[in-house]
Amino acid sequence: MMARRDPKSWAKRLVRAQTLQKQRRAPVGPRSPPPDEEDPRLKCKNCGAFGHTARSTRCPMKCWKAALVPATLGKKEGKENLKPWKPRAEANPGPLNKDKGEKEERPRQQDPQRKALLHMFSGKPPEKPLPNGKGSTESSDYLRVASGPMPVHTTSKRPRLDPVLADRSATEMSGRGSVLASLSPLRKASLSSSSSLGPKERQTGAAADMPQPAVRHQGREPLLVVKPTHSRPEGGCREVPQAASKTHGLLQAARPQAQDKRPAVTPQPCPPAATHSLGLGSNLSFGPGAKRPAQAPIQACLNFPKKPRLGPFQIPESAIQGGELGAPENLQPPPAATELGPSTSPQMGRRTPAQVPSVDRQPPHSRPCLPTAQACTMSHHPAASHDGAQPLRVLFRRLENGRWSSSLLAAPSFHSPEKPGAFLAQSPHVSEKSEAPCVRVPPSVLYEDLQVSSSSEDSDSDLE
């Protein structure tokens, strides 16, 4: 009967009995699998952890209430700095400590050198160092403060100038003193007031407070200084500065023929401002060395100031070279201050023979010296017609030595610029000087002579 029993059934019974015993022995809660059962190659899709699959009972998503904290795989030692680094002893300094020590020793060695330089520049006696070392910091405290500049040692002796510069400065001071000595007290005051101006403002502002204009010479070319009027009407002449610049070339060659003889001057009072005619008869002789042509228009217009100024005028008795053909004439001042001062009532600022360079140039080609007289009417500005101003006429003469002389003639009271013959017959100055036989020379001859001379002078200036 024992042999009839099936061994397979007996084995099944044994397995069941073992499983029942295990279930009885097992705790009520879920148990964690042993670490040997985890496979790191598996990954759970529910929780994302490695070691089990989504079907495994070890997944915390299935047994959420009894989820266990995952155990660490192993200890990670050596990453945390449990023993911090201790500072090295001073007996064995590293390379960085050696560099720091050298940098500290260098400024200590430079301190005495810096003190010596400071004593040399400041001139102060050396201070005794204090025992606690405070003197070194106090002596260089002002270097750290940006309140004042660094003191510079200066000697009481003046620097020695170059002999060439010293001679030049001495000549400038002597020349300035001689010019101031020859001027009137009014001009001294005006020059002293204009000394603070710039070089360009000083030239035009020297005669700003003067009642009469003057011609100042600076260098080789004379400078034309015109006094501006105090009250200028609306219809005044606007082209006067252009005319004054054009006459600058004509007045450049106006020099006395005999430099050692100075003509006597006679004071003449200024006439009242009631007269409204431009009574002028001045002779200006100039050679062919002028840079500007003779046909430069000279325009004059009268501007009546509010208060007429009365003062003496210094006028030469005879013209510079006009006495060779006619009688000497005196310049009369204008009835009012005009903007064309030097062309109507010029006061020539003449220099001494040592200062005036003698330029006596002859014409390049010889022409027959004919004593000619020709009156020409200069262009008149139409804006000044309602002021009662008359056109200015100039009489050109050719002298025996190849020079040309010009005379400023007075215009008649009525307007007749179209008839120069009647004007010459009525002018008293022309009647006195036209006694000699006159030959009329066309204006082209005058223009040709002056054009050739101006071109030759320009070439000479380029060569210099």
From Swiss-Prot:
Coiled coil: none
Biased composition (Low complexity): 180-197
InterPro entries reported in the protein's UniProt record: FAM90, Znf-CCHC_6
Pfam entry (one): zf-CCHC_6
Comp. bias regions, Basic and acidic residues: 74-89, 97-114
Region (Disordered): 1-42, 69-389, 415-437
Family recorded in the similarity comment: Belongs to the FAM90 family.
The protein's name: Protein FAM90A23
